[in-house]
């Protein structure tokens, strides 16, 4: 498709399937005008417009079928090309490829293989597409929907999954509902954009479960605004903010650096240390009017003015007002952890609150109630969204989390009856699950995916049953797994077309002729009464009913198939296409702080990582962890150490285009010299856990700049994750 160099975007209008009649529905993608000095206005997701009847070819021979396009696209990725790009010898790559694909040797469908990844994949300017590549491989191998299969993330925090589920990112509402944009002028228009129509090939059917989006959205609005959300006032749709630009992490800090964002709440987030280009973040905080920090320890963000290198004169010029609130630690509060398998596990507080510490919900509630009071007294441009927020908790100043969890689960606002089973739920009762949600205002639910987690039977998240009859690690009575306590998503794919498990000794779900329904050791991820002869596609959340080797509708900013691009800073040009070495839709931030180096000046690759003995920036306040690894180091490959005469324990100075970092050398054989596209290349590694605040730094006596003083502020164009895993530096003895 056409690439617009000015806007750094593709024309995505043809990123779609062909219709059975040969037509292709063009995608309509409306642009949002740029606001202020913001570098990247966001566009609303394109309308979900797949052809009603899709063209298909079971022979996989049509030159435009997805399979043939996929083969053509990846025909350039020969084992020799893989070696040129990655430095992995051809023989090692082939050995790994043969091992993983051997599970399907001779057509054997019994085995399953998983791909497990962490931020080593995500923290690149093509990170989302790297994970997409893994998904394509797993789809081709039949490893999706299988116990022991899938693409599984190892999280860097114990509740990343829960934070995302509950809209911890700017472009979604709870339950992964896309936020409204200024082009959504009514609830109806918003739902039309979000709700996909089924795209059914003549050969199979589609459940298209996202067609229930209006039920999820109306129930969410009732949870948020209660009686103020009615059909007559468009379900309070106009109370919702209309997101007109990118508000992801890097953009917020960039806007603070530009003077657009005047203040920030930093809760559970050491922004100076965790973000790219620590110095830019420090300079951004210098320009802020106020900073509110909610932490259990002082950190680099709450005391940003103590950064090494800030002079007394500079400190006098800083006018930022800092409020540090006394928060509770994880062991001092109850709530839930949600792991990567989507298990909602309830925990109880193990310790009393120390001193003046407050629970998170009390801090947030008191801030909200004070803001509401100010709007009541003083008015404002648009107070309705604040004044009408539903806040009917027993203790408004400090809501019990169990009460909040019940609200998230959902309840009936009127008497309900299932038309098929005649089961009834009385008004005020907890909902058994999301299948009961309505779009007429008779149900309330804070997150449709969590419905079923706190029912009339009690707190399902607190269950601790260890029985596992299947032996597959399903443990159906341990906690609650969204959605519907289902442990393996798309588990219909664990059976053949006739509904028989691929592996009869490891049965997940199956079609029961006796009951004429799907049954199993897991909750079937399928329409319960859809017979195998109905040929319903197993991927019920996609309107086409099948897994996506090709991503239609412009859902990915950089292409329907993944493509390799070099990091923004790389020692080589991209062997696949040197004329476009880096991801073309990645937008660099445009301030004087945003500097990028070249291999001419910076000849070493640097990556950052975490250690087993430390947890981000918090355990450096724990004496036991500090005893295990008391100080940072720079991991240097033995070959580079020999070349430069570096000995273990010598202090090194590492410099990037953005900053300088010093620590002792640790010479290892873990990191190897690489030959990338014929060029001898070296890489160093720096753990991220240290800075200038904590007992590990001897309360400032051994303070240093954070490791991320070196990394660039540049992000993946889909998930907006910074590129921490590959940038250029030079290494010298200090």
Model-identified regions with their sequence ranges:
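Long, well-ordered, tryptophan-enriched scaffold segments
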Residues: 1-107, 196, 364, 370
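Extended redox/cofactor-interaction regions of prokaryotic respiratory oxidoreductases
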Residues: 38-54, 61, 66-69, 73, ...
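Glycine/threonine-rich phosphate-binding loop and adjacent beta-strand/alpha-helix elements that clamp
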Residues: 320-323, 330-352, 550, 688
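Long, contiguous, secondary-structure-rich segments that constitute the structural scaffold
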Residues: 362-418, 519-531, 539-545, 550-574, ...
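Long, C-terminal catalytic modules of enzymes
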Residues: 335, 342-443, 447-449, 454, ...
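Flexible, glycine/charged-enriched surface loops at secondary-structure junctions
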Residues: 108-114, 145-154, 377-386
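Short acidic (Asp/Glu) and glycine-rich catalytic loops that position anionic groups and cofactors
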Residues: 48-50, 72-78, 109-117, 230-232, ...
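Conserved short loop/turn motifs at secondary-structure junctions
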Residues: 81-89, 117-125, 154-158, 268-273
């Amino acid at each position: 498709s056409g690439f617009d160099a000015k806007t750094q975007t593709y024309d995505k209008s043809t990123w779609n399937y062909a219709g059975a009649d040969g037509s292709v529905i063009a995608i309509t993608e409306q642009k949002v005008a740029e606001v202020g000095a913001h570098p990247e206005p966001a566009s609303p997701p394109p309308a979900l417009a797949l052809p009603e009847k899709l063209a298909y070819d079971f022979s996989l021979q049509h030159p435009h079928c997805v399979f043939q396009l996929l083969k053509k696209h990846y025909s350039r990725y020969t084992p020799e090309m893989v070696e040129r790009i990655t430095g992995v010898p051809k023989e090692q790559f082939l050995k790994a490829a043969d091992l993983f694909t051997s599970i399907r040797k001779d057509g054997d469908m019994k085995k399953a293989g998983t791909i497990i990844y962490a931020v080593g994949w995500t923290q690149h300017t093509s990170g989302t597409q790297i994970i997409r590549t893994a998904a394509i491989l797993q789809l081709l191998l039949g490893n999706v929907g299988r116990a022991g299969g899938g693409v599984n993330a190892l999280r860097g925090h114990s509740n990343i999954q829960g934070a995302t589920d509950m809209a911890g990112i700017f472009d979604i509402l709870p339950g992964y509902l896309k936020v409204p944009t200024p082009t959504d002028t009514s609830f109806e228009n918003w739902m039309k954009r979000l709700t996909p129509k089924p795209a059914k090939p003549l050969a199979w059917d589609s459940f298209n479960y996202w067609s229930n989006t209006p039920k999820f959205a109306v129930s969410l609005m009732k949870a948020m605004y209660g009686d103020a959300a009615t059909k007559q006032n468009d379900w309070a749709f106009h109370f919702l903010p209309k997101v007109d630009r990118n508000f992801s992490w890097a953009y917020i800090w960039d806007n603070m650096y530009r003077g657009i964002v005047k203040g920030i709440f930093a809760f559970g987030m050491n922004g100076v240390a965790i973000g790219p280009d620590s110095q830019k973040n420090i300079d951004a905080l210098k320009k802020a009017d106020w900073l509110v920090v909610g932490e259990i320890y002082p950190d680099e963000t709450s005391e940003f003015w103590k950064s090494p290198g800030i002079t007394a004169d500079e400190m006098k010029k800083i006018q930022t007002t800092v409020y540090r609130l006394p928060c509770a630690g994880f062991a001092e509060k109850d709530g839930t952890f949600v792991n990567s398998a989507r298990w909602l596990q309830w925990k109880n507080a193990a310790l009393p609150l120390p001193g003046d510490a407050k629970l998170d919900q009390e801090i947030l509630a008191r801030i909200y109630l004070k803001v509401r009071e100010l709007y009541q007294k003083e008015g404002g441009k648009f107070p309705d969204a604040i004044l009408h927020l539903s806040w009917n908790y027993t203790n408004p100043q400090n809501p019990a989390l169990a009460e909040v969890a019940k609200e998230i689960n959902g309840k009936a606002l009127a008497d309900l009856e299932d038309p098929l089973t005649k089961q009834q739920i009385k008004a005020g009762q907890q909902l058994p699950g999301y299948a009961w949600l309505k779009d007429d205002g008779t149900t309330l639910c804070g997150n449709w995916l969590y419905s079923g987690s706190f029912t009339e039977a009690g707190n399902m998240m607190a269950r601790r049953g260890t029985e596992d009859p299947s032996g597959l690690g399903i443990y159906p009575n341990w906690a609650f797994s969204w959605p519907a306590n289902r442990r393996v998503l798309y588990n219909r794919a664990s059976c053949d077309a006739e509904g028989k498990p691929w592996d009869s000794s490891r049965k997940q779900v199956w079609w029961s002729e006796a009951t004429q329904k799907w049954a199993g050791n897991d909750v079937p991820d399928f329409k319960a009464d859809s017979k195998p002869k109905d040929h319903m596609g197993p991927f019920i959340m996609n309107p086409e009913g099948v897994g996506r080797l090709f991503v239609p509708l412009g859902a990915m900013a950089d292409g329907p198939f993944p493509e390799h691009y070099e990091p923004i800073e790389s020692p080589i040009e991209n062997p696949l296409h040197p004329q476009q070495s880096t991801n073309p839709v990645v937008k660099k931030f445009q301030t004087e702080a945003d500097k990028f180096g070249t291999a001419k000046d910076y000849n070493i690759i640097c990556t950052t990582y975490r250690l087993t003995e430390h947890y981000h920036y918090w355990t450096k306040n724990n004496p036991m962890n500090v005893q295990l690894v008391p100080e940072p180091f720079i991991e240097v490959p033995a070959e580079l150490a020999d070349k430069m005469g570096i000995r273990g324990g010598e202090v090194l100075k590492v410099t990037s285009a953005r900053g300088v970092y010093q620590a002792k050398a640790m010479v290892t054989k873990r990191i190897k010299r690489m030959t990338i596209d014929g060029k001898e290349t070296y890489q160093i590694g720096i753990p991220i856990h240290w800075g200038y605040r904590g007992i590990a730094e001897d309360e400032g006596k051994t303070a240093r700049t954070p490791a991320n003083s070196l990394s660039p502020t540049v992000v993946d164009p889909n998930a907006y994750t910074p590129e921490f895993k590959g940038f250029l530096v030079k290494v010298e003895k200090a």
